[in-house]
């Protein structure tokens, strides 16, 4: 490696410190150094394309955290590595291991948990699974990137103990235990300093204290300086072309502001990452990205969806006996297609299955009736891809030059490809010398409405755009007004009404061309709304009343939960709450399915026959849900976050200094009292507590024994079918030199228990179970003294409390 560094010119070295494109690092052909490619995860691997090429859509981070199953998460990591290889990707930008401070945060669904121990256990397995597959993880966002409000500028004001004891724990575990190969710095500041310019965090903690030898990558456009960032330890500015590193760094070296040895160290780390991920090896894939639909990976995705679903309430209704169900009403806006979160984690799935379809197959002898009931869109929703011909396919034709690619023009496209999403984005060069500011796109498909009447169609675009049906202009956005779409470079939504006939196929065409060659970004989002129907709410209630059982599928979607903005509150969008109440009034035999990425208010939960929290379960979610409803599988998830009764009940309360922040600063004054640690310490009951989740079995904790630091639990299933237990072990400090939470998760074991065979699980508590961060010694201390070990089924459902004496351990 030193030999290669010695052969590089200063310009070549510095070229390896910045992206060349949105997703790639430049190659150095004369030395055989190929380009490194990164891609968004963490819930799928999109590849370099942002125009709708298909990838397997995995369950979101909250669902993964809900599995409480590190072995399964390792398999998930392997499946993600396979997806990455199919796209020629060397680095997955994930997982997200930020701790959930407030459930209002827009990217809560990407995180694993509010608890640092659980997050760390899941993260370690995830990273090991991916990297054992020869693909790097870039764990993110380092550090305290816990809200979207002012995320590009906010300063997280956090004390040393809280930082180390809560927010850095998952990163530390990923480095020390999993050997993660890359870390992404966060957009925000910590205590007034940009995360990418924090020498104490990057060189001091990450590399010095933890021994990290990998690459430190900026979040996209999250670099703010040359000397400060380079000196702090940032290795790679993304995306390209660079603004602060790359050639600007070379100038800083030549002018004596940065020592060349600093650049050499960055290059060595880049070359090490390339070596670890096989860049340029015989097995390294070429640039072609495949849309592989692998059955093995799909099976893993379904298992994660199943084990990540939490049975919150069950009044004996689930599982349903298919033979006893003659009619079922499937109701709700997410019953037609389960939603996923928005932002950089979103991918275009291979499969679009509805809950109504999947349940209809499992309840083959029953009459299934679907009614939407209400809508949850924030403005117009993306056009329903099931109404687009060719299995939801557009043809994108590319034209050289910035002119409008009108239908019937003499110009011929130089290239064409199929895309599969209603939102398409081109960034940077389509090919060498042809940037997104210098070519145009014509997008075509057939559109077959499923309802007759007055539809609303619309466009948002980065660039100029026109929408045609059968050649006639329906929406004209050729003179766009600047809006918030496409990272603030796009237009406001332009929409119009058109009368359409159900079952008739229309030729749909979108013409998209640049507004300015100086903006290397071109994008379009096609939206549509069906004719308004004032009777859909009443019809949904009526079919529920007339059916043996009702399944109401509600939740959120990527318009409400997304990178870029937080949620305004914890309520279900639109009239969904009223719909649930009305259906429960009509039929108490109602299963409520919540398809959302973070906690929601559920004032109706105690009236429901059953409540399932599926999170965003990915493209296998509908079939996984149907299997669970009829008992072919069990929802074995447990909550990785607390569900408050109201948003202001949580640790950040209603104090705007703690959230969303005041004058560019957000205070972390809650300290170590995050999530359940807060609720248990102050004695407040959440709506659903951390670790909660029911089973289809009837499992009792028959014996609990704690000898020294070894915990042993015997479980007996008194039900008539196999059930799953997640034994949770908490520690309470009785003699602590610092204030501690009432209880802290220190271990867990997930196990299936058969009715005829008791199971015994064991867990050994090590020094980490008793530790706290000692500010005076700048390290962890496991203080000697009296403790209690709490063993239970959740943070509040404690089955045994056993006192023990811990002899202590030196600072480490």
At which residue positions do the language-model features occur?
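Short beta-strand edge segments in extracellular beta-sheet folds
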Residues: 803-811
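Glycoside hydrolase catalytic-domain context in secreted enzymes
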Residues: 1-775, 779-796, 810-812
């Amino acid at each position: 490696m030193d030999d290669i560094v010695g052969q590089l010119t200063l310009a070549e070295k510095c070229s390896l410190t910045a992206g060349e494109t949105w997703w790639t690092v430049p190659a150095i052909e004369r030395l055989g150094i190929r380009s490194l490619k990164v891609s968004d995860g963490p819930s799928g691997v999109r590849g370099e394309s942002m125009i709708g090429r298909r990838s397997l859509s995995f369950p979101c981070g909250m669902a993964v955290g809900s599995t409480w199953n590190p072995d399964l998460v390792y398999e998930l990591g392997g499946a993600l590595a396979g997806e990455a290889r199919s796209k020629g990707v060397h680095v997955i930008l994930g997982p997200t291991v930020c701790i959930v401070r407030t459930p209002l945060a827009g990217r809560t669904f990407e995180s694993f948990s509010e608890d640092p121990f659980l997050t760390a256990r899941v993260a370690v397995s995830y990273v090991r699974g991916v990297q054992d597959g020869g693909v790097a993880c870039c764990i993110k966002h380092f550090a305290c990137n816990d809200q979207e409000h002012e995320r590009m500028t906010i300063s997280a004001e956090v004390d040393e103990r809280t930082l180390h004891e809560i927010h850095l724990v998952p990163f530390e575990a990923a480095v020390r235990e999993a050997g993660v190969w890359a870390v992404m710095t966060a957009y925000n500041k910590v205590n007034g300093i940009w995360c990418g310019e924090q020498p104490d965090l990057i060189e001091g903690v990450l590399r010095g204290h933890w021994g990290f030898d990998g690459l430190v990558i900026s979040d996209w456009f999250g670099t703010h300086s040359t000397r400060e960032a380079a000196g702090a330890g940032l290795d790679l500015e993304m995306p390209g072309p660079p603004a602060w590193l790359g050639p600007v760094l070379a100038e800083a070296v030549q002018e004596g502001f940065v020592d060349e040895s600093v650049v050499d160290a960055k290059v060595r780390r880049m070359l090490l990452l390339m070596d670890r991920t096989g860049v340029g090896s015989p097995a390294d894939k070429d640039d072609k990205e495949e849309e592989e639909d692998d059955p093995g990976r799909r099976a893993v995705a379904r298992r994660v969806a199943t084990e990540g679903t939490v049975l919150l309430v069950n009044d004996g209704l689930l599982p349903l006996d298919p033979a006893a169900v003659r009619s079922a009403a499937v109701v709700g806006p997410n019953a037609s297609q389960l939603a996923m979160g928005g932002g950089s984690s979103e991918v275009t799935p291979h499969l679009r299955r509805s809950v109504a379809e999947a349940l209809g197959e499992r309840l083959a002898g029953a009459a299934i009736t679907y009614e939407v009931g209400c809508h949850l869109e924030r403005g117009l929703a993306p056009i329903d891809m099931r109404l687009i011909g060719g299995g939801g396919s557009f043809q994108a034709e590319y034209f050289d030059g910035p002119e409008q690619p009108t239908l019937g023009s003499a110009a011929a496209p130089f290239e064409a490809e199929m895309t599969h999403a209603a939102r398409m984005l081109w960034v940077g060069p389509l090919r060498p010398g042809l940037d997104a500011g210098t070519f145009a796109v014509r997008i075509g498909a057939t559109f077959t409405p499923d309802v007759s009447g007055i539809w609303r169609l619309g466009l948002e675009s980065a660039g100029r755009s026109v929408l045609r049906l059968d050649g006639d202009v329906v929406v004209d956005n050729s003179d766009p007004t600047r809006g918030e779409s496409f990272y603030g470079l796009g237009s406001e939504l332009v929409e119009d009404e058109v009368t359409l006939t159900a079952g008739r196929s229309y030729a749909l065409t979108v013409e998209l061309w640049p507004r300015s060659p100086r903006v290397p970004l071109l994008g379009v989002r096609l939206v549509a709304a069906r004719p308004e129907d004032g009777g859909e709410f009443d019809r949904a209630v009526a079919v529920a009343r007339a059916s043996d059982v009702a399944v109401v599928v509600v939740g959120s979607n990527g318009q409400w939960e997304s990178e870029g903005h937080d949620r305004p509150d914890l309520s279900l969008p639109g009239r969904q709450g009223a719909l649930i109440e009305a259906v429960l009034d009509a039929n108490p035999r109602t299963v409520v399915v919540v398809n959302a990425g973070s906690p929601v208010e559920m004032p109706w939960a105690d009236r429901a026959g059953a409540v399932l929290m599926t999170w965003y379960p990915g493209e296998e979610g509908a079939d996984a849900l149907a299997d669970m409803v009829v008992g072919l599988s069990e929802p074995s998830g447990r909550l990785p976050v607390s569900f408050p009764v109201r948003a202001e009940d949580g640790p950040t309360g209603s104090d705007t200094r703690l959230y969303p922040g005041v004058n560019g600063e957000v205070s972390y004054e809650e300290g170590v009292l995050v999530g359940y640690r807060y609720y248990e310490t102050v004695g407040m009951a959440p709506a659903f507590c951390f670790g909660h989740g029911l089973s289809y079995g009837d499992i009792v904790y028959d014996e609990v024994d704690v000898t020294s630091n070894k915990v042993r639990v015997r479980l007996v299933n008194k039900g008539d079918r196999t059930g799953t237990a997640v034994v949770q072990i908490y520690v309470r400090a009785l003699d602590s030199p610092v204030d501690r939470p009432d209880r802290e998760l220190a271990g867990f074991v997930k196990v299936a228990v058969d009715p005829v065979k008791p199971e015994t699980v064991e867990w050994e508590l090590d020094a980490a179970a008793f530790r706290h961060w000692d500010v005076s010694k700048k390290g962890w201390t496991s203080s000697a003294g009296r403790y209690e070990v709490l063993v239970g089924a959740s943070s509040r459902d404690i089955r045994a409390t056993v006192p023990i004496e811990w002899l202590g351990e030196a600072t480490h």
